[in-house]
């Protein structure tokens, strides 16, 4: 009988650890996503500044300006794909019957 109580206790402990690990993973994902969004924002600002410099004739290095614009465009496309995949995964999860 004592072994059964030990098993129940171990099961409760493992369930507690699983929920704590899931929360930790969610927090890590949220931090990673926030960092990527901040990087995207910086790339967009850099691209906009480069376009403004080109439009006003104040550009010092056209090649670097073109790289900044291309980087901003690529970053935005990548983030849109991540968003689309996240939405697709969410829809698939909501369709799953339990």
From Swiss-Prot:
- Matching Pfam families, A to Z? FliE (PF02049)
GO CC annotation: bacterial-type flagellum basal body
List, as start-end ranges, the regions of compositional bias called Low complexity: 1-23
The entry lists its GO molecular-function terms as: cytoskeletal motor activity; structural molecule activity
Its GO biological process annotations read: bacterial-type flagellum-dependent cell motility
Where is the protein situated, by its record's location annotation? Answer: Bacterial flagellum basal body
Keyword terms of this UniProt record: Bacterial flagellum
Alphabetized InterPro entries for the sequence: FliE (IPR001624)
- Region (Disordered) spans which residues? 1-24
Q: Which family does it belong to?
A: Belongs to the FliE family.
Q: Which NCBIfam families does the annotation name?
A: fliE
- Which protein are we looking at? Flagellar hook-basal body complex protein FliE
Q: What is the source species?
A: Campylobacter jejuni subsp. jejuni serotype O:2 (strain ATCC 700819 / NCTC 11168)
